[in-house]
């Protein structure tokens, strides 16, 4: 998904996905969580990394579960669980937020890019996607994320917006990309190993 989004934005970076068990900062701020995980991931891999932290914030619950949404996805029924949580509430409005943190390597200050999509929750519909995609309808759409194909979803998703911001920043600060390329030339290894995308 990330490779496709960034390639469509004109920055087809080679990415390698790693599942890592990182200590996670407990905070209501997705930006702070992403930055903290990014520092740990950079130390663990010894190279440049991207880390994504996703939140789903429900208006009726004062913004909860927010970054704690992952704990509602453990049983594969997160969409239905969220809908039942809103029983009795008039508002079904929500927003999805992705915080993508990027670091050039250990010791570097992570850059955090945020994307947000407003929408509302409905009864589960669709089979694509994962987590709560089947219950979230983005503003201006009539279908859930799970009813969209990946190309359509990637044009409007919260993650796409965060990655678009990051891509724009990297184009405007090309010295970061030059440094990564020079590091690669100085340390011969497969280019695919130079970037890591960590998602939890």
Map each language-model feature to its residues.
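Anionic-ligand binding patches
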Residues: 1-199
């Amino acid at each position: 998904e990330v490779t496709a989004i960034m390639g469509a934005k004109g920055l087809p970076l080679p990415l390698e996905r790693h599942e890592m068990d990182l200590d996670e900062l407990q905070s209501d701020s997705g930006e702070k969580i992403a930055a903290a995980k990014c520092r740990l991931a950079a130390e663990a891999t010894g190279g440049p990394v991207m880390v994504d932290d996703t939140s789903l914030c429900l208006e009726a619950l004062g913004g909860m579960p927010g970054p704690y949404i992952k704990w509602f996805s453990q049983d594969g029924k997160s969409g239905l669980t969220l809908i039942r949580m809103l029983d009795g509430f008039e508002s079904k409005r929500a927003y999805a937020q992705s915080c993508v943190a990027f670091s050039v390597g250990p010791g570097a200050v992570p850059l955090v890019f945020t994307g947000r999509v407003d929408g509302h929750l409905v009864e589960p519909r669709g089979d694509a996607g994962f987590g709560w995609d089947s219950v979230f309808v983005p503003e201006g759409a009539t279908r859930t994320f799970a009813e969209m194909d990946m190309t359509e979803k990637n044009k409007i998703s919260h993650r796409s917006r965060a990655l678009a911001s990051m891509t724009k920043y990297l184009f405007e600060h090309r010295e970061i990309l030059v440094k990564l390329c020079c590091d690669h030339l100085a340390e011969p290894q497969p280019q695919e190993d130079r970037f890591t995308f960590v998602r939890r």
